[in-house]
Amino acid sequence: MVKAAVTGAAGRMGARIISVIGDTEGIELVGAIEHSEHYALGQDAGEVAGVGKLGIEISSDVDAVVKKADVLIDFTFPDVTIENLAVVSKHKKSAVIGSTGFSGAEMEEVKKIASNISCIIAPNMSIGVNLMLKLVAEAARTLGDDFDIEMVETHHKLKKDAPSGTAMKLAEVAADAVGRNLSEVGVFERFGMTGARGKKEIGVQTLRGGDVVGDHTVYFYGTGERLEITHRATSRDTFATGAVKGALWISGKAPGLYDMQDVLGLK
């Protein structure tokens, strides 16, 4: 039985992860974490998540919670994730990281800390999106420079980072497939007299509104035709299910950095 701890336990994602853990064989919740000033501290994690009493109090003591777990599932913010990973590394546990919005320097810090543990880092845990990553790479390689690559992502109005981590990963995959460096060809804003589109540009546009869980579309524009690859998430359960699948998979794995492509056998 894999013993899991969940950060952000009183948040939208944390609640769904706790619910999915309860419905999944081979894994159990042993700890729930929130920040030191959260209103839910001391409350039962199951009751806060809406799944009934579990006998596990939400705590801000990351060290104590991680110590009794096998794997930490972390959907928080970059600075919090880095702090949590340091504790996971200290106790030689495993981690599943779904946080997004990392800067280049922050991601390097994450990789450095996580290098001596078994750790999954993925901007999107859904099965559909991870299959989409593979399809986008294949389409980009096949269509090559004859097709313009653009993408649009939409999320709920409360999302703090933009573009989404998933959109950035899709753009990176497409750029790699056609031999380009996204930092050189990525275009994240167009306004005014921008001139004609550069042949090698990869555009990423962001929309925010309502309660959209997550929509991503990659467009390949050719002459006289257009290919669209779209994924729409209608429930956070798709991410929670992937995270729990990842927690089951990573337990007992050799130290190293993995992603959901490894978990799903898509590599």
Give the positions of each predicted feature:
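Rossmann-fold NAD(P)-binding glycine/threonine-rich loop
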Residues: 82-91, 98-121, 130-139
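Extreme N-terminal starter segment of soluble prokaryotic enzymes
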Residues: 1-4
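Short glycine-/small-residue-rich Rossmann-like dinucleotide-binding loops
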Residues: 70, 76-77, 100, 206-208
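C-terminal substrate-binding/catalytic lobe of Rossmann-fold NAD(P)-dependent oxidoreductases
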Residues: 7, 12-63, 144-267
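Short, ordered loop/turn segments at secondary-structure junctions
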Residues: 35, 100-102, 124-126, 154-156
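Residue-level detector of anion-binding/catalytic polar loops
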Residues: 71, 94, 118, 148, ...
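Rossmann-like NAD(P)-binding element
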Residues: 63-83, 89, 93-94
